[in-house]
Amino acid sequence: MITLTGHTLTIEEMKRLLLEGEGVTACPTSMQKVAECREVVEKIVEDGKVVYGITTGFGKFSDVLIQKDDVKALQHNLIQSHACGIGDPFPEEVSRGMLILRANTMLKGVSGVRPLVVNMLLEFVNRKIHPVVPQQGSLGASGDLAPLSHLALVLLGEGEVFYKGKRVHAMVALTEEGLEPIELEAKEGLALINGTQAMTAQGVLSYIEAEATAYQAELIASMTIEGLQGIIDAFDENVHKARGYKEQVDVASRIRDILHDSKLTTKQGELRVQDAYSLRCIPQVHGASWQVLNYVKEKLEIEMNAATDNPLIFDGGEKVISGGNFHGQPIAFAMDFLKVGMAELANISERRIERLVNPQLNDLPPFLSPEPGLQSGAMIMQYAAASLVSENKTLAHPASVDSIPSSANQEDHVSMGTIASRHAHQIIQNARRVLSIEMICAMQAAEYRGIENMSTVTKSFYHQGRQQVPSITNDRIFSTDIENIAHWLKTNYSIKERLDVNAAL
């Protein structure tokens, strides 16, 4: 059970919450702050003060005063009218993440909701009732209005949820769990939907998958180095310390550890003086992607604990301030950066695939075919990898450089952060498949070189891989092999803290 405070949630805890289904509870001190802040909102309504989002309309209607008797109707109308998402739903892990992050931001005690609302969000998390939230429709400012409205709907007993492996109406799940839908009071509708939790939840899942994929890429690249009898000198510690990037030094160190007892690597001058960049520069390229991942993790952990709705309430109600914390620009930039970092891992992997299958670049059978000419072997797998990396180049176009005004030009600059976050996740799926193709080719190359000559670590990884796909002895439908390896990589390693050398043993 993980305790939410509004201030301390980490990526490592989100791994447990999203991928292992761990439950959550609220910090009592934080809940007390929620209750105290709520008293401020109720006094504002009782006194008839004009405060945006509490006693006024929204967006362009901010100058419309709402009568006390209409405050509840205002909240309900807001949720229904803003539930305008379209397209396929977010993965269930993302909608679960949205519930967690929305509760966590409310626990900062500046949003003005009742403790009841926070408790309802936590009930949904712990009972694994996850909103069906369409992926499209958010501009990323005022936050993720459309996606979060679909989240808010289910608290009211409306909309759909994922529940016990099925997609059902929210009331079906609520009834089975013995829960009553809530009725929103002043400000609560706006507090639920004005924030960055869709882009951030998707970003967290993307980061978790990207981190695992980056570690896996090092193991797979190490197998390729063996298959191509790569020169180990390029990974010497002195080379990488001379440049000074910690991430580069770390990648080189891990690859040295992975290959320390390999009989397939060579020394410079034995077979050739130096390798092509896709082998020799693995620490420099993979290390740069790790720099991206470290940046993204830092920004996500800030946003996971951020108050991103509007207005915010401070100093016991002395200050009720309309600001712009809902603007998703920091996450939009981070997700665009993540897209580039992961696309590059796929790019260099595809070049290693080419070196494994091209007979002009190695002494292996052409396209790793058991009968070159009669059987095509891995020829079209390289085509597939090339297609995926080219698609990634399109998806990697920065969403954050775009903006389009909305709400009668009141909201005249937006982040497109949710588009960036969604595209980052797509790129990661593509990158994993490219790496799966590289792994299939590297395993085949290892067989030609002699499995007994592999390092202890890569040999273990090879045998695990062969449990997923057999050796290429005849042409077959390789699409199934690629998907099997990709699924195995995702499900067997994505919940680990990291893929270290011992994880493969």
UniProtKB/Swiss-Prot annotation:
One of its GO terms (cellular component) is cytoplasm. One of its GO terms (biological process) is L-histidine catabolic process to glutamate and formamide. There is a cross-link at A141-G143 (5-imidazolinone (Ala-Gly)). Gene3D superfamilies: Fumarase/aspartase (Central domain), Fumarase/aspartase (N-terminal domain). Keywords: Cytoplasm, Histidine metabolism, Lyase. Its EC number is 4.3.1.3. GO terms for molecular function: histidine ammonia-lyase activity. The modification 2,3-didehydroalanine (Ser) is found at S142. Contains an active site 4-methylidene-imidazol-5-one (MIO), which is formed autocatalytically by cyclization and dehydration of residues Ala-Ser-Gly. InterPro entries: Aromatic_Lyase (IPR001106), Fumarase/histidase_N (IPR024083), HutH (IPR005921), L-Aspartase-like (IPR008948), Phe/His_NH3-lyase_AS (IPR022313). It catalyses: L-histidine = trans-urocanate + NH4(+). Pathway: Amino-acid degradation; L-histidine degradation into L-glutamate; N-formimidoyl-L-glutamate from L-histidine: step 1/3. It is found in: Cytoplasm. NCBIfam families: hutH, PRK09367.1. Belongs to the PAL/histidase family. HAMAP family: His_ammonia_lyase (MF_00229). This is Histidine ammonia-lyase. It comes from Bacillus cereus (strain G9842). The gene is hutH.
